[in-house]
Amino acid sequence: MKVDILSREYPPKVYGGAGVHAEELSKVLAERVDVTVRAFDGPRTAADIPAIPGTDPKGSLTVVGYDVPKELEDANGALKTFGVDLQIANDVDADIIHAHTWYACLAGYLAKMLHDTPLVITAHSLEPFRPWKREQLGGGYNLSSWAEKDAYEHADRVIAVSAGMREDILTAYPNLDPDKVVVVHNGITMSQFETPADDDPGWKVFERYNIDRNKPTLLFVGRITRQKGLPYLLQALHFVDPNIQVVLCAGAPDTPEIMEEVKTAFAKLDEERGNIIWIEEMLPKPELNALEHGCDAFICPSIYEPLGIVNLEAMACGLPVVASATGGIPEVVV
């Protein structure tokens, strides 16, 4: 059997939970079947392809990356996405198509019609529940919403990453047959979150960012987007004991405007209480794992979160999680 996984994110271009999901799913599926990942952000090299777990895989893993067509380089973000989708839809060659997020939904829907191939969509978020995306896409938000709606309503199966997400899907798309929508919770590979050895180079992240391992420390990990609630967290931290150190791993802003908003709020907080470190880069996995093992609690202030893989990862590192009760978070934070 051949499965084509369609995703905007895939290593080394991963910035959120959907990318983590796509990577881990592709590796596990490739133990059993032939998998081709068709992803955004340009060609991949052999070094970018993750290793298939297990000693005797029955399948294979191929990764094909696509660039935005030159003619669309200055176009609206949604049109750039559609330019990649058209290339992917043309190339699909599989028994099952599995699309992730609205970015790849149109590719999946077009490929389903073009090649008469069953389409599965995993719902990581929903455009109707993210109105702030209009800040990023402008009128393109109308296009992304249209593409997502059509793809979902014509999919052969829709996977919700939580029970809360399933309810949201059926609310957003009432024409969708409820029997086609199933819940498969996101998971993680526990062995990836074991405590690093004392000489593990990942611990150097504390020295590089001047993080004091002897102080009680709160950790936030997430993109700079309305969804993740970082501006609210920066306001709330004014009321937290200044002796508590705060580390923010926050980058990949949706828009220049929200980046400026966060910079202003951070500067105000830093002036008032200090003891706060902002890491804007995407940390390598060994460093993020060490950071989570070296902190004392994890904060997730999301205002919209279908599941929240970051919470699973934090708990796997033994961190208590303080999270907002939204979406699928109450199903996994226990």
Regions found by a protein language model. Name each.
Residues M1-I52:
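N-terminal subdomain of nucleotide-sugar transferases
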